């Protein structure tokens, strides 16, 4: 007979049936704390993507922000891998994934190839922050049947023209004074002001940015999106969407959140108090609770 130490069965059920929404229940089997874990590289058109896969259950994919990588989601993977199959990736040009080549590519097609290669048959939940939001929204528009739900945190979208957030200044710095100088310049951007208030968060953030190659700052990026751009197609998104902003994030990302909420019929908008652009890292417990409630109850 299995004991509590070597076998546990956890069933998550919601009593209010009328609130059952995306994931009505999840059952997790754990054996001596063991969970499935694998990592590697998936070939994509003219490149390869690094991924880590943890846990078991309905699939969830995490999409990081610009100049960052899969490490920004560690506190989410640690939590959600208890209930879901967590696929955490480095988008092309970032982290351990290959740099762009001369051929055009798109994030959403890269994600499609990766999911197919991992034999992910059922629709996925895409959890994304900042630049990752572009990838998530484009994927949901290109492959609606493979999209279960979206979580868009301080997200960017194709077709939006920023007013307070200018990456060209960082590119100019990299080209004129070098990538290392540009990294220090970027770390002082207003989007990271709130993260600086937490030493451990900023240390992790700084580590990722200092390891960034700087490729996008020095080269013309052959990435392509959708036509027309996503901002003109938001009403076509039928999947449920959770929109999250950090209270202290800059105006542009607050504006994008309003645009998303006003144009996506099945969307819910939440704000995390005392958090900035990196809300999932600054307030991981609050972020995880909001996402978990959304996936279980749709709220």
Model-derived segments and spans:
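Active-site loop/oxyanion-hole signature of alpha/beta-hydrolase fold enzymes
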Residues: 45, 87-127, 131, 289
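Short beta-strand/loop motif that positions the catalytic acidic residue
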Residues: 237, 243-245
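Conserved HGGG/HGGXW glycine-rich cap/lid loop of the alpha/beta-hydrolase fold
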Residues: 50-98
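Conserved alpha/beta-hydrolase catalytic His-Asp/Glu region
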Residues: 161-163, 176-233
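Alpha/beta-hydrolase fold catalytic core
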Residues: 2-60, 83-84, 292, 296-299
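Conserved alpha/beta-hydrolase "acid-adjacent" motif
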Residues: 250-256
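Catalytic active-site module of serine/aspartate enzymes centered on a nucleophile-bearing elbow/loop
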Residues: 267-299
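Flexible "cap/lid" loop of the alpha/beta hydrolase fold
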Residues: 137-142, 148-178
């Amino acid at each position: 007979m299995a004991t509590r130490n070597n076998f546990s069965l956890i069933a998550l059920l919601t009593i209010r049936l009328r609130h059952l929404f995306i994931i009505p229940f999840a059952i997790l089997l754990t054996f001596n704390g063991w969970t499935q874990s694998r990592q590697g590289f998936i070939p994509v058109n003219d490149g390869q993507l690094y991924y880590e896969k943890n846990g078991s259950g309905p699939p969830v994919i995490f999409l990081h922000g610009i100049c960052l990588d899969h490490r920004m989601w560690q506190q989410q993977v640690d939590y959600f891998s208890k209930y879901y199959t967590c696929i955490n990736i480095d988008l092309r040009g970032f982290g351990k994934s290959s740099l762009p080549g001369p051929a055009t590519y798109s994030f959403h097609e890269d994600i499609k190839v990766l999911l197919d290669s991992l034999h992910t048959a059922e629709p996925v939940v895409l959890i994304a922050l900042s630049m990752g939001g572009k990838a998530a929204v484009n994927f949901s528009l290109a492959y609606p049947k493979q999209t279960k739900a979206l979580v868009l945190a301080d997200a960017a979208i194709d077709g939006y023209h920023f007013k307070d957030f200018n990456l060209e200044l960082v590119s100019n710095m990299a080209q004129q004074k070098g990538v290392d100088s540009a990294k220090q310049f970027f770390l002082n951007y207003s989007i990271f002001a709130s993260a600086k208030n937490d030493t451990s968060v900023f240390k992790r953030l700084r580590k990722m940015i200092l390891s960034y190659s700087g490729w996008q700052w020095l080269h013309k990026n052959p990435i392509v999106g959708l036509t027309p751009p996503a901002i003109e197609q938001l009403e076509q998104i039928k999947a449920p969407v959770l929109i999250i902003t950090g209270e202290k994030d800059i105006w542009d990302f607050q504006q994008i959140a309003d645009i998303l909420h006003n144009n996506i019929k099945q969307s819910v908008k939440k704000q995390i108090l005392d958090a900035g652009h990196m809300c999932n890292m600054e307030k991981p417990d609050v972020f995880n609770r909001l996402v978990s409630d959304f996936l279980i109850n749709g709220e």
